Amino acid sequence: MIPVLLIFIPLVAGLFTFFVKGNGSKQLALASSVATLAISLLSIFVYTSVKFGNFDASWIPTLGTRFTLSLDGMSKMLTLLTAISFPIIFAATYKNEYKNANQFYALMLLTQTGLMGVFLAADCLLFYFFWELAIIPVYFLCSIWGGEKRIAVTFKFFVYTFLGSLLMLVGILFLYFKTPHHSFAIKDFYALKLTAQEQSLSFWLFFIAFAIKMPIFPFHTWQPDAYEQSPTAVTMVLSGIMVKMGIFAVIGWLVPIFPDAAHSNAMLIVVLSVIGMLYASLIAMKQDDMKRLIAYSSIAHIGLMCAAIFSMNDIGLKGVMIQMFNHGINVIGLWIVADAIEQKTGTRKLSELGGLAHKAPVLAIMFVVLAFANIALPLTNAFVGEFLMFNGLFEFNVYITAAALISIILAAVYTLTMVQKLFYGNTVTATEKTGEVGTNVQLMLAVIVVVVIVFGVYPQPMIDLTKDTVNAVFGK
């Protein structure tokens, strides 16, 4: 029942929130997200038996599809990321006002429902259903509550994701008709014996859909604009959690179903990913807008994760799984700071800011910790995952690894430059009357900083969660 609760708590709360007026909608959203977090923690620390982590019920028997959910190590990690992120997002942005707030929070909770379903589904049609459920509310969140260019940006986002979803649906149906008894069960997809040509065609149908969602070069062009124009709470969901849908799907669905195609296309995908890392890092160095800088930084991080997956070894895959969680937590922290600064000063431009450490020393200290995590310094949570990913890449190809390592230097440059421009030097007009951020923001940043330090010093619990998935993917 644990997987069912992880899905139905935000679903029921989201539907109910549509009818709640005033501050009650945000209070209900926060309360339901805390309840979901409690269930997620129980799944990891208390109800660890397989019987609590699996659920199977009839759904549409005439189509050969069932409502099958499963919690393995990777699912636990990503459902925990989703569960911990939403209360942090709701609490950190609690004082933000939204027109028709009940609709805003209802759509956010429906997005959480879809995300949970994606990470839990063990039936491919059910997976596709939740994939769309996670995406569709975001269209409305961006188009209704976004910035001045929200309509054009949302349309671009829609075109990209619709194309990806269509290709994935074609791939799902192709595999469905290849199964002996017309089944959507993941175990039946794993058991398929496809020819090299069938694997190659199906592989690309799925991979393009997942690459758009991550996104990696050259499928990334929707992302910076979407992050810039979306409400910051939505941007946190997009960059902290939703991009992990694509990475999760590559690990849990793509590589196990099409192992031969994954190996034969590995070099091409690794090269594209590393090109994307370097390209995004160089573009990030030129950004004056905090949101766009963080967006391009995220593209670089995701590029490394994709490259490490297709290094096709267990050490790289362990690093990716650890980094999915850590990147999600860290980037949400960066967005919280960006939103707090914009709320206080009215600007996101680095050239119009400075000296904030004198006005908001607590915020400065926390942001420096997050900046260190963004460049994966030792004793931060990002270090272990990044170290393992580069180890995996090194086993795959030394020269590609050397090129990828340049992105670390570039990340240090643009991240520390952002710290310097925001917090040090003399105060400017925008920051002269600025004070410390609200208590709610400080508390949520403190939670994130604790996670950064705890998993930086003691990452073993996260490493343990990766074992069963790594063994399943590589058949050990």
What does each of the following model-derived ranges do?
Residues 217, 331-337, 400-434:
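Predominantly late transmembrane helices and immediately cytosolic-facing juxtamembrane segments
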